[in-house]
């Protein structure tokens, strides 16, 4: 963690599924002076964050299975965003909701409508005829 901080990192993201002691890792990151995000894979329930949600700055919901670009958006992610937004509201957490995978203009609009704050749009941008225009259109969601 120290080495990452020393590189100038402002936020460190850890996968829920990769941490045996998530709370300890979150606290170590915060103690190092960085913000912290926790990532959930598509099959991991939002409920797994109940005990940690007040301690994190952002939650990244994967809307495809990690590994390679160009996958189709997993539709039940919309329900997960709604559930996470409710958890954040009910606990007084200030965490942002980020979604990565299969994000384009259509899915991006749906995600923003159900409560997403941050969108990661790889192929929608890099395969667009005009990347600048696509970025502008995504930002306007």
Language model features: what each stretch is:
Residues 29, 112, 124-141:
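C-terminal helical cap(s) of enzyme catalytic domains, especially alpha/beta-barrels
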Residues 4, 59, 84, 100, ...:
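Conserved, mostly hydrophobic/aromatic
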Residues 65-67, 102-105, 125-126:
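Short Gly/Pro-enriched loop/turn and capping motifs at secondary-structure junctions
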Residues 46, 105-106:
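Short loop/turn elements that flank and shape the SAM/SAH-binding pocket of Class I
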């Amino acid at each position: 963690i120290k080495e990452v901080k020393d590189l100038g990192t402002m936020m460190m993201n850890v996968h829920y599924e990769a941490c045996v002691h998530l709370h300890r890792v979150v606290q170590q990151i915060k103690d190092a002076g960085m913000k912290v995000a926790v990532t959930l894979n598509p099959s991991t329930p939002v409920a797994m964050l109940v005990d940690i949600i007040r301690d994190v700055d952002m939650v990244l919901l994967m809307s495809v299975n990690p590994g390679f670009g160009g996958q189709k958006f997993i539709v039940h992610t919309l329900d997960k965003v709604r559930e996470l937004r409710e958890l954040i509201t009910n606990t007084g957490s200030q965490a942002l909701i980020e979604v990565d995978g299969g994000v384009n203009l259509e899915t991006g609009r749906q995600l923003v409508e159900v409560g997403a704050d941050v969108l990661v749009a790889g192929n929608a941008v890099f395969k667009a005829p005009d990347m600048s225009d696509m970025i502008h259109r995504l930002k306007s969601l």
